[in-house]
């Protein structure tokens, strides 16, 4: 019974990461700034890796791996991110900040369970990735680095004209 419970919790984490991939897809489809796109794509790749890592454990414990597609909750997250992203880069990042804060809280809660050392180590590693994501997105919303990038491009094109 405990093993089934552990598999269910691992599946929940894997599904959360699969849902995050969909949200990143939605944001990336609307963000034109290369600087932001590159960073968000890196975070998307992290979430894909999390799904793969968690699925390996799920399979090892006899469970059914999670598909890399959003469930109902993930579809809602992706739709909300897509709609918000239509209002520009800052709005897209605010939506992603909410998604990453939720993911961070979920990983923090997951670490309250009694896991084997191998599983705990993996969840801690993923949580550190999530912290890095939320810190970058929060800072990007605060400092708007894409505006500096636009200004630099604009200044450079004026100098050449």
Go through the PLM ranges and name each one.
Residues 1-161:
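Iron-associated oxidoreductase/ferritin-like identity signal
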């Amino acid at each position: 019974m405990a093993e089934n419970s552990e598999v269910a919790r691992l599946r929940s984490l894997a599904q959360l990461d699969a849902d995050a991939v969909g949200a990143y897809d939605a944001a990336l489809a609307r963000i034109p700034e290369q600087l932001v796109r590159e960073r968000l794509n890196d975070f998307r790749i992290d979430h894909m890796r999390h799904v793969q890592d968690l699925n390996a454990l799920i399979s090892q414990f006899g469970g059914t791996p999670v598909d890399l597609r959003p469930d109902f909750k993930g579809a809602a997250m992706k739709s909300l991110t897509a709609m918000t992203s239509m209002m520009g880069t800052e709005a897209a990042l605010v939506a992603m900040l909410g998604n990453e804060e939720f993911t961070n809280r979920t990983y923090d809660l997951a670490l309250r369970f009694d896991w084997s050392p191998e599983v705990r180590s993996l969840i801690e590693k993923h949580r550190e990735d999530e912290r890095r994501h939320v810190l970058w997105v929060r800072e990007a919303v605060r400092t708007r680095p894409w505006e500096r990038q636009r200004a630099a491009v604009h200044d450079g094109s004026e100098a050449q004209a």
